[in-house]
Regions:
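Catalytic Walker B motif of ABC-type/P-loop ATPase nucleotide-binding domains
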Residues: 186-190
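Conserved ABC transporter NBD signature motif
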Residues: 83-91, 100
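The feature captures the beta-strand-to-loop junction immediately N-terminal to the Walker
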Residues: 60-62
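ABC ATPase nucleotide-binding domains
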Residues: 261-283
Length: 283
């Protein structure tokens, strides 16, 4: 828990971390059981892919394709009905809560805070997997919270109130809270949803830098085809609960496949850097 007033935190410079991870998803499937008997049951899978530290992976697909459902399986919030999801050889759903939170951080779609918090207090909440019950934060907690703020360029925000931040500032602080957990696997559910184009590019650049420099495996649920192509190493493409393609953007971005998935007339052209660009026909 944070001490009253948030306390003065040490001002630290982030250094490249040692996080490295191997995520293995093997024939994982899941089903949402409908509460209304007349409604169809949504089924995801089977899904298979792997991800490593220093990789930025996008989970792409239209609404109701299973992207967020897959993320809850990766985070261990739900258990696959069949198949396995492992992090460094450990089955995610079998990990004890604190042990899982020390390996995996999930940034869900933005929700309202129940009570006002300063940025520093909010980021310190990310240290819960390491804190003993009814204890104030330790020097080590402050060290990692300060490093997390530095990693996202939010040092100067530490004394601000969360409800006074802009959309881009708030997204950086939410990311810092996740980084304070010291995860090796970072999962984000549509983090660009409320950002303008400049904010979206800045966030993807930051995630790319976190993967490259701090060796996280980063997985992002997004609708942003072009940004995913530009910044991500690999794509997991979902459609109606099925995993259609897994591969590099150049391997996945086939015109006929994307038109089927997104139900729109599209063109795919290659940029000089070898990454595909998707153009909506008639735009």
């Amino acid at each position: 828990m944070s001490s009253a007033g948030g306390g003065a935190a040490p001002r630290l410079t982030a250094t490249p971390g040692t996080a490295i991870v191997h995520l293995k998803v093997e024939q994982a499937s899941y089903a949402h059981l409908a509460t209304d008997r007349s409604a169809p049951t949504f089924t995801l899978g089977p899904v298979s892919f792997e991800a490593q530290g220093q990789e930025l992976v996008a989970i792409l697909g239209p609404n109701a394709s299973g992207k967020s459902t897959l993320l809850t399986l990766l985070a261990g919030l739900n258990k696959p009905l069949s198949g396995r999801i492992e992090v460094d050889g450990n089955e995610v759903s079998q990990l004890e809560l604190r042990a899982r939170a020390q390996r995996i951080a999930l940034v869900q779609q933005e929700s309202e805070l129940l009570f006002p918090l300063r940025v520093w207090e909010y980021v310190l909440q990310g240290r819960y997997p390491y804190q003993r019950r009814l204890r104030f934060e330790s020097d080590e907690d402050c060290l990692f919270a300060g490093n997390a703020l530095a990693q996202v360029g939010a040092d100067l925000l530490r004394d601000r109130w969360m409800d006074q931040l802009s959309g881009g500032e708030k997204q950086r602080v939410i990311l810092a809270r996740a980084l304070a957990q010291q995860p090796s696997l970072l999962l984000l559910d549509e983090p660009t949803q409320h950002l303008d184009i400049g904010g979206k590019v800045e966030l993807l650049r930051r995630l790319r830098r976190l993967a490259d420099t701090h060796r996280y495996a980063v997985m992002v649920v997004t609708h942003e085809l072009d940004l995913a192509s530009e910044f991500c190493d690999r794509i997991v493409l979902l459609h109606k609960g099925r995993c259609l393609r897994v591969g590099t953007p150049a391997e996945v971005y086939e015109r006929a496949v994307l038109e089927e998935v997104f139900e729109a007339p599209l063109e795919v052209e290659m940029r000089p850097n070898g990454r595909p660009r998707v153009i909506l026909q008639g735009s």
